[in-house]
Amino acid sequence: MKPMHIAMALFSAAMFFVLAGVFMGVQLELDGTKLVVDTAADIRWQWIFIGTAVVFFFQLLRPMFQKAVKHVSGPKFILPAIDGSTVKQKLFLMALLVIAVAWPFMVSRGSVDIATMTMIYIILGLGLNVVVGLSGLLVLGYGGFYAIGAYTFALLNHYYGLGFWTCLPLAGLVSAAAGFLLGFPVLRLRGDYLAIVTLGFGEIVRILLLNNTEITGGPNGISQIPKPTLFGLEFSRSTREGGWDTFSNFFGVKYDPSDRVIFLYLVALLLVVLSLFVINRLLRMPLGRAWEALREDEIACRSLGLSPTRIKLTAFTISAAFAGFAGTLFAARQGFVSPESFTFAESAFVLAIVVLGGMGSQFAVILAAVLLVVSRELMRDFNEYSMLMLGGLMVLMMIWRPQGLLPMTRPQLKLKSGQAKGEQA
């Protein structure tokens, strides 16, 4: 163990202790008309000391840890692309689909509701993966398109009485139009500049929704958003005003509140399957190759006769459309939307799904969405530290496996040893 490693471990632990002591170790209390700084509860200091010890030993043992896991991040840990191109992959995908359809009938109502939220984040992750993972454009304000889709459904239902299935394509079109309009001012921007512009866009959308109280309801939001129906049959005890009939009354079965949750899950699953189908078809088209060319080298992309302007516009437009679909599903699940549901934390969470899973890989996005959403639901007691945990997880991933859990594999051709020697000769 080198003295430099010990010194770095002590320095990192000291920095963590100071920062955690400031943010977690003190609290403000109201004493009459003034605020008084007081020490926090003992349980917080216990966690601070535990975190300090973890940081110290992690920094101390990191060189040995990196050597030990070097073989884990090798090629054998990279799974092949799962796109249904082979018979085995088709059978595997069919088995997953059957399990996903049968699963809500075997678990509790709460588990199905969490799975529905997971499906929403899968759609968001797949959409953001188009512009970040495939096109190489860093977007930090994806929550703005998400909010546009949700509020499109809420406003059309509130003012015009339109249902879920009518608003679903309209919300996608409105969000796609917003992505198309945003694409024009960012055509010449790259990297950090593009990220700042998109971050500003997401905040502008949220603030407009927050301040426009006459139309959007401001901070109070919009409530009483209906759930999707099955050919006009509502999954409720009684029909809404102007409704046709209920599912239980039409089929003569006993009313079960779980039917509404299960049907919403199946709708979300259908949208996920359609999203995967559309994206995989696009990747096999020249447009998908153009996205990858733009990500690898924009100058080379121009030299091949491709227009980066059109490629960026299509990426922004298609990505925003998926966010609109997810926003509609989110509004239907919640039955209520407000600007506080679309903060920067949502955009960061979706970006973490894409980065941690592996940029460019659809299967990796699904895996990361399941892991992160389920983990967040299980750690509801630590909700105030969710962004801290998410940031720490991303730091660890960038150190251990910067390419993501399951990075996208690219087609490769390898010459046999005999052919290689013949070419060298």
Swiss-Prot record:
GO molecular function terms attached to this record: branched-chain amino acid transmembrane transporter activity
Swiss-Prot/TrEMBL keywords: Amino-acid transport, Cell inner membrane, Cell membrane, Membrane, Transmembrane, Transmembrane helix, Transport
Biological process annotations from GO: amino acid transport; branched-chain amino acid transport
Pfam family of the protein (one): BPD_transp_2
Transmembrane annotation, as ranges: 6-26, 45-65, 92-112, 120-140, 145-165, 167-187, 191-211, 260-280, 311-331, 353-373, 388-408
Disulfide bridges in this chain: none
Membrane topology listed for this record: Multi-pass membrane protein
Broad class of where this protein is predominantly found: membrane
GO CC, any one term: plasma membrane
Location of the protein in the cell: Cell inner membrane
Function, as annotated: Part of the binding-protein-dependent transport system for branched-chain amino acids. Probably responsible for the translocation of the substrates across the membrane.
Family, similarity comment: Belongs to the binding-protein-dependent transport system permease family. LivHM subfamily.
Name of the molecule in the record: High-affinity branched-chain amino acid transport system permease protein LivM
Organism: Salmonella typhimurium (strain LT2 / SGSC1412 / ATCC 700720)
Gene: livM
